[in-house]
Swiss-Prot record:
Gene: gutB
SUPFAM superfamilies: GroES-like, NAD(P)-binding Rossmann-fold domains
Entries under PROSITE patterns matching the protein: ADH_ZINC
Keywords: Metal-binding, NAD, Oxidoreductase, Zinc
Residue positions binding substrate: 146
Domain of life, per lineage: Bacteria
GO MF entry, a single one: D-xylulose reductase activity
Binding site for NAD(+): 174, 200, 262-264
Protein EC: 1.1.1.-, 1.1.1.14, 1.1.1.9
Name this protein carries in UniProt: Sorbitol dehydrogenase
A matching Pfam family: ADH_zinc_N
Purpose: Polyol dehydrogenase that catalyzes the NAD(+)-dependent oxidation of various sugar alcohols. Is active with D-sorbitol (D-glucitol), xylitol and L-iditol as substrates, leading to the C2-oxidized products D-fructose, D-xylulose and L-sorbose, respectively.
Organism phylogeny: Bacteria, Bacillati, Bacillota, Bacilli, Bacillales
Cofactor stoichiometry and binding remark: Binds 1 Zn(2+) ion per subunit.
């Protein structure tokens, strides 16, 4: 089969290669990939900022159909429509594993990072990571369950009450999903971007976000102040991984506000104003990926139409058209890009 592989570390080094079709082991299934999403981490990997176990087939956001069962698999059948968590293996013994926080296991191996992922015709997933797709969730939307689960995970680390003002920085796919999840909690939501984010900001309005703001044209601090009688935002979800946005997020928060870092920074060390965090008693939390408890709620949000993921898909390419996908994302033309396998 053909697979899109990160062949070695460094910038670039993506190639479509011929690989043997995988065979499911015990308690594993073989899935024929329908759609697989391009994640921000895939972009970071291509640019050499995000380490993976190269050579490895990338891809971890996907929907598909089970075509083969490994020994001992129960509860799933050939022909089932599924998606899978990104966890391929864990130690199963540490305190994080026993509490269901698989994303924090030091020995965890993830699809598309340490284990071959979904930028291929077939992918192997373990039974424990599988989720049936509800009838009301189409294959394109289902391929975005993983990023939606990530936003659910981040928002679960905060407390959003009806009427709270939530600022989401970064109108990429994660930001647009996070904004919709925040709306589902009853928050009044502002999503921010830059002048080259017009397509994404327009989409934010289409999916019902209260305010979609170009911060190069509008004084966001003044708007937040007007909406909160000078107090500031209750919650900031930083989804861009951009240092200026992170600094702005801290500045926009009210005293005792909540800040969640969701986006990945290109460089791991950044300057942060901890004096503001201290003086305003801001709660700061990091959010890494997702865990099993986030997946069924994410699928319910899709099935109940509280989140519209499909409308975020603007471009589709085959795995052999990576260059086109990359440039569509980097230019700001694309919102969400899905890839399809090739024979």
């Amino acid at each position: 089969m053909k697979a899109l592989v990160k062949t070695q570390h460094g910038t670039g080094h993506f190639a479509v290669q011929e690989k043997p079709e995988p065979t499911p082991g015990k308690h594993q299934v073989k899935i024929k990939v329908k759609y697989t999403g391009v994640c921000g981490s895939d972009i970071h990997t291509y640019e050499g900022h995000y380490p993976v176990a190269a050579p490895v087939t990338l891809g971890h956001e996907f929907s598909g159909e089970i075509v083969e069962l490994g020994e001992g698999v129960t509860g799933f059948n050939v022909g089932d429509r599924v998606t899978s968590e990104t966890t391929y293996s864990i130690c199963g013994k540490c305190s994080y594993c026993t509490s269901g926080d698989y994303n924090l296991c030091s020995h965890r191996k993830g699809l598309g990072n340490q284990q071959d992922g979904s930028f291929a015709k077939y992918v192997i997933a373990r039974q424990e990571s599988l989720h049936h797709l509800p009838a009301g969730v189409d294959d394109r939307s289902a391929a975005m369950t993983e990023p939606l689960a990530c936003t659910h995970h981040a928002i679960a680390k905060t407390s959003i009450n009806k009427g709270d003002l939530v600022v989401v920085t970064g109108p990429g796919p994660i930001g647009l999903l996070a904004a919709q999840v925040a709306k589902s909690h009853g928050g009044t939501v502002i999503i921010t971007g830059l002048s080259n984010d017009q397509v994404r900001l327009k989409k934010a309005k289409e999916v019902g976000i209260d305010y979609a703001i170009d911060t190069q044209e509008v004084d966001i601090k003044e708007l937040v102040s007007e909406l909160t009688d000078g107090y500031g935002a209750d919650v900031v979800l930083e989804c861009s991984g951009a240092v200026p946005a992170a600094k702005q997020g801290i500045d926009l928060l009210r005293k005792k506000g909540q800040y969640a870092q969701v986006g990945l920074f290109a460089q791991p060390e950044i300057q942060f104003n901890f004096e503001k965090i201290i003086q305003k008693e801001i709660s700061v939390v990091g959010s890494r990926s997702q865990k099993p408890a986030d997946w069924e709620p994410a699928l319910s949000l899709l099935n109940e139409k509280k989140v519209n993921a499909k409308t975020l898909v603007t471009h589709e390419y085959t795995i052999s058209e990576w260059d086109k996908a990359y440039h569509a994302i980097k230019s700001g033309e694309a919102i969400k890009v899905l890839l399809t396998p090739i024979d």
